[in-house]
Amino acid sequence: MTRLEKIFKQTSAKKKILVTYTVAGDPSLKTSKKILDDLVSSGADILEIGVPFSDPMSEGPVIQKAHERALKKNIEFKDILNICKQIRKKNSSVPIVLMGYMNSFLSLKNKLAKELFLAGVDGVIVVDLPYDESKSFFENLRQEDIDLIRLISPTTDSKRLKQMLASSSGYLYYVSLKGITGAELKNFDEVKKKVKKIKSLTHLPVVVGFGIKDAKTAKKMASFSDGIVAVSYTHLRAHE
């Protein structure tokens, strides 16, 4: 059983999974490592680590600035893998998921899956993964038991959803609104309806992210999903 499978096995009506999102290297690699350690100590169930990218198209102003600050520190993919290795040495159970854009993952070419495995990474989320490359990308990752976590949006139709599920593992990330991160979420009923539909088609857990700005929203989203994604407070504070 993988680390992700183990953590989601603990899910119940009263216990939902907290996924925390932190951009690696903002404000520095050393601070990122401390933030991630603190998040685990504070109860984070899954660490989602953002890979800095020059054009993070799905992100709102707060996370875009976090990417910019990290890139100014000349953060490279190998640096992020080193952070993962350090976390894994200290904690053997917390799942680590890298979230980024295709070009970042392609930097390791055919060594990607092996390097992720050696760093103790459990899964990846590729925001701009081309559909025609998803099957081979998924199969390569699975050779090292790395999960490919797919982003499902409000505009994903039934046909496309079923196709995506064929190359998905670990869990599914439902993007609760159209647009960029940080926008305000208003239509809870629509999100609930979509999550329910997704869960009827797969055994994979579904977490909800985007638009979750406070405890009230998080609680509401968790009531019909397996967990929620929360952005590290550090990025929000740095943007003020």
Ranges and model annotations:
Residues 122-133, 148-155:
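Catalytic beta/alpha-barrel core
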Residues 32-37, 159-162, 212-225:
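Catalytic cores of alpha/beta
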Residues 2, 58-60, 77-81, 128-141, ...:
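Active-site-adjacent beta->alpha loops and helix N-cap segments on the catalytic face
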Residues 234-240:
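Conserved small/polar residues in nucleotide/adenosyl-binding loops
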Residues 48-75, 178-183:
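Glycine-rich, proline-tolerant flexible connector loops at the mouths of alpha/beta enzymes
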Residues 67-125:
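Active-site beta->alpha loop and helix N-cap motifs at the rims of alpha/beta catalytic domains
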Residues 1-19:
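N-terminal amphipathic alpha-helix/helix-capping segment at the start of soluble metabolic enzymes
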Residues 63, 73, 161-200:
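Glycine/Thr-rich beta-alpha phosphate-binding loop at enzyme active sites
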